A protein has these predicted regions:
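Short solvent-exposed strand/turn elements
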Residues: 23, 123-130
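Intrinsically disordered, low-complexity regions enriched in acidic/Ser/Thr/Pro/Gln residues
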Residues: 119-121
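Internal active-site segments that recognize and position negatively charged phosphoryl groups
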Residues: 136-163
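A glycine-rich beta-to-alpha transition motif near the start of alpha/beta enzyme domains, typified by
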Residues: 1-115, 155-272
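C-terminal domain-closing interface element
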Residues: 127-131, 135-140, 145-146, 256-272
């Protein structure tokens, strides 16, 4: 099996291609390949497959074998791989149009140098943002925000991001009974004020640890800032490892024209 190892702001993936048809892969095989001691090592595995109606299809799995959700960083990596492997782009602006578990996406390579690229990815509309009442504690807002940006996210604003125990606090809210049975990804955001970059740390379910970045979490954090009253044309957000930009439109309670821009890198390719 040929595979490609990618990272997007430290969020790393194993990518495989199967343009001839749907690839069968069991959850235990995903777990084995993503294991950092006995496998290749990754936060998730992505399959680039052929599509009857679009340029290609994307399937994503967390490193615990769970699937059926979208991954923003993985979506940007798969767009870069489509470009490197010569898959034609059908969009008039040079973008690839592809199907994913949550619907149809467009992705375009903005720039590329060697193994590194900057990729912009369109995401689906966000139709519901739910305010969640939180216990009043030092350093934490009394209101958090829950939404689905391709997968389920909770955004909590804090003013102590550097000292925060993300593993402990992330697990606490990921398994909170209000979000059972599936749980949520948990993003902790430090907000400095208008025009300042938002800082984000994410506890990712499926990985069950703090990831260096999470694309759908970055989007959720920007939307939560908008809900908090910070209205911008474009948001700059810094994860533990890199910087992203997010833009969207808002009308009648719906966030549309959602776009995520950030870095990708082809680390290596090999045969297993």
């Amino acid at each position: 099996m040929d595979f490609y190892k990618y990272q997007a702001a430290g969020n790393d993936f194993v990518l495989v291609t199967s343009m001839e048809g749907r690839a069968d892969i069991a959850a235990d095989e995903v777990i084995r390949l993503c294991d950092r001691r006995y496998g290749i090592g990754a936060d998730g595995l992505i399959i680039l497959e052929g599509s009857r109606d679009y340029d290609f299809a994307m399937r994503f799995f967390n490193n615990d074998g769970s699937g059926g959700m979208m991954c923003g960083n993985g979506g940007r990596c798969i767009v870069d791989l489509a470009g490197r492997t010569g898959i034609p782009a059908s969009g008039k602006d040079g973008s690839w149009i592809f199907e994913a578990p949550d619907g149809i996406h467009r992705g375009r390579i903005v720039s590329s140098q060697g193994r590194r690229s900057t990729v912009i990815l369109s995401m689906n509309d966000i139709t519901s943002v739910e305010p969640i009442e939180m216990p009043e504690t030092d350093g934490q807002d009394s209101k958090a925000w829950r939404m689905n940006t391709g997968t389920d996210h909770l955004v909590i604003f804090r003013d102590d991001l550097d000292s925060l125990d993300v593993l402990k606090e992330g697990r606490r809210w990921r398994y909170d009974s209000r979000f059972a049975p599936k749980g949520v990804n948990v993003n902790f955001v430090q907000y400095s004020g208008q025009e300042e970059a938002l800082r984000v740390r994410t506890y990712e379910k499926g990985v069950e640890y703090e990831t260096l970045s999470c694309g759908t979490g970055i989007i959720a954090s920007a939307v939560a800032a908008w809900m908090k009253g910070d209205r911008r044309e474009k948001y700059t957000l810094r994860s533990t490892s890199d910087t992203f930009s997010v833009s969207f439109s808002h009308r009648s309670g719906i966030f549309s024209n959602v776009e995520l821009t950030g870095p990708t890198e082809l680390v290596f390719q090999a045969t297993l």
